[in-house]
Each structure stands twice: as structure tokens, then as C-alpha cells.
Swiss-Prot record:
This is Bacilliredoxin BCE_2233. The lineage of its organism: Bacteria, Bacillati, Bacillota, Bacilli, Bacillales. It comes from the Bacteria. Belongs to the bacilliredoxin family. Pfam families: Disulph_isomer (PF06491). GO terms for biological process: cell redox homeostasis. It comes from Bacillus cereus (strain ATCC 10987 / NRS 248). InterPro entries: BrxB/BrxA.
Length: 144
């Protein structure tokens, strides 16, 4: 059963979801969608663990969107899960991150099912947009 707070949050995060979707990211909103995607996808994937926090709005989402536009080499796939909103999907995605502690927002570059690059929240909070974009571009150059 949905309460007023949950409905408010669902409405509030719509623009936060759409920002990544407009940049070409596919939303994975269920545990099953995450499993199906990971188990049936080859190549490289940039995963953005989205969040409602200010560093997601001001740094993570715009940096991810700009990096995939600017980079010469790009991941084959772009997906996102939303921490705190799509809890089962986020928990399932984090299982594929292995021993990496939960962090939101965060970004993971996967090669197949293996995490080859990870950007934690603390690396996002203390960086500029250009630094995050460069971090991603270098990871794409090395792994894509």
C-alpha cells in the first residue's frame, strides 16, 4: 500500500530519472530487469546509481551525461538504478559490484559482469564536473 510520502517521492524524482534517460540511459527499476540485463549483456556498461542528493543533481547526473557525449570511446550500454526509490533493483545491481561498499550516487563501468572502474560518492562530492567527466573518459579509453 502506498502512503502520501511514497507518492510524493515518486513524483519528486521524475525529473531526476528523466535527466539520465534523456542522456541515453535505460532505467532498470526491478530486480528482474537488472538480472535480465546483466545476465544477457556483453560488452561494456556504464551503470549510474542515481540518488536524490545534491551531489547527484549537481555533479553525478550531468557528468555522466556529458561524459558519454564527449568521450571518443564509449560504453556499449548505459543503465541506471535509483537508490532509495527502486530498492530491489539497486540491491540487485550492487550484488554485481562484489565487495565494493554501497555508495549513492556512484558510477560503475562493467566489462561483461566485472567492475573495471568505480566512482564512489566521496569521489563525486569532492570533485568538479570536469574532473568527473575526465575520470569517466579515461576509464572509457582504457576499457571500451
Amino acid at each position: 500500500m502506498s502512503n502520501a510520502y511514497e507518492e510524493y517521492m515518486r513524483q519528486m524524482v521524475i525529473p531526476m530519472r528523466q535527466e539520465l534517460v534523456r542522456s541515453g540511459f535505460e532505467e532498470l527499476t526491478t530486480e528482474e530487469a537488472v538480472t535480465e540485463f546483466i545476465e544477457n549483456t556483453t560488452g561494456t556498461t556504464l551503470v549510474v546509481v542515481n540518488s536524490v542528493c545534491g551531489c547527484a543533481a549537481g555533479l553525478a547526473r550531468p557528468s555522466a551525461g556529458q561524459a558519454v557525449v564527449r568521450a571518443e570511446k564509449q560504453p556499449d550500454h548505459l543503465v541506471t538504478v535509483f537508490a532509495g526509490q527502486d530498492k530491489d533493483a539497486t540491491a540487485k545491481m550492487r550484488e554485481y559490484f562484489g565487495e565494493i561498499p554501497p555508495s549513492s550516487p556512484s558510477m560503475a563501468l562493467l566489462k561483461g559482469k566485472e567492475v573495471v572502474h568505480f566512482i564512489h560518492r566521496h569521489e563525486i562530492e569532492g570533485a568538479t564536473m570536469d574532473e568527473i567527466i575526465t575520470n569517466l573518459e579515461q576509464a572509457f579509453e582504457k576499457n571500451c
